């Protein structure tokens, strides 16, 4: 591979599709970053709602902003396009409908240089728009770097944000500054699967020498409602994501070493996705007949999933160890799900309506 040239300290890659209502604010957040030596790469994934015109307004004003427009190819292809055009020493991937504090790039870049780290992770907020509730990642990061493999194993424990006392690394991408050379030299590409972030984060951790952390809350991810059909179908598609992860571990020669961790991860991954889809359905349907129909469909899909031989194999393995190292809420919910998908859905709705809001 040719030597990688760094024209900027950081390349900010913002991918968007029909984000006219939110894109202006996000680009402003990127422009107003206190780190001056940066470029902003805007990838339009076939928008038709005026998003491209908003992006062009900023590109015409600032020389460090570049726009690339393509037919609708999905988030993974958009991010790869952004990476191919980037010239920064580090890259960061932001979504076109979120918000960022102005010092994020400067703080993360300075930590990366101080520690000579390949990746720097930060804290974040999740904003549930449907119920107007803002939550933050609860666990403090360590004040020392980890090796990439240590961060990877921690991620397998945590899944996304089950908030165990020893587990703090999560599989989101927008909170992480990544050395561009790490991605390019290892030919790491985005996978066209659901929850592509966690697959990508696994890959970069496995190739990283050092991962650092900052405890600042810089990024706010807004959880918006998707379509009901896609919210249920994502459960079917999750098996492909898990197969991709298993293939990755085998390719790296660490599947046997991590097999027990992976089985627990498998269960918590399905728990996280199913729990999130129940949230989407709970807060996005006002018509009682439609609500009941989708609820029945979801219960049917959950019955299919728990009937998978892989699911039962992982469940029996975790059960044999008393569900050790699986966090309390996932542990309870997985037991309920394995007993009755209907009870699992009803209890999940109860938790959302009476606990998440408070």
Curated annotation (Swiss-Prot):
It is an enzyme of class 2 (transferase). Keywords: Glycosyltransferase, Lipid biosynthesis, Lipid metabolism, Transferase. It comes from the Bacteria. It holds the Pfam family Glycos_transf_2. The keyword Cell membrane does not apply. Its EC number is 2.4.1.-. Pathway: Glycolipid biosynthesis. Disruption phenotype: Mutations in the predicted active site result in a recombinant protein that is unable to catalyze the formation of the cholesterol glycolipid. It catalyses: cholesterol + UDP-alpha-D-galactose = cholesteryl 3-beta-D-galactoside + UDP + H(+). InterPro entries: Glyco_trans_2-like, Nucleotide-diphossugar_trans. GO terms for molecular function: glycosyltransferase activity. GO terms for biological process: lipid metabolic process. Belongs to the glycosyltransferase 2 family. Galactosyltransferase involved in the synthesis of cholesterol glycolipids, which are formed by the use of host-derived cholesterol and have been shown to be immunogenic, and possibly contribute to Lyme disease pathogenesis. Catalyzes the formation of cholesteryl beta-D-galactopyranoside (CGal) from cholesterol and UDP-alpha-D-galactose. Cannot use GDP-mannose. This is Cholesterol galactosyltransferase. The lineage of its organism: Bacteria, Pseudomonadati, Spirochaetota, Spirochaetia, Spirochaetales.
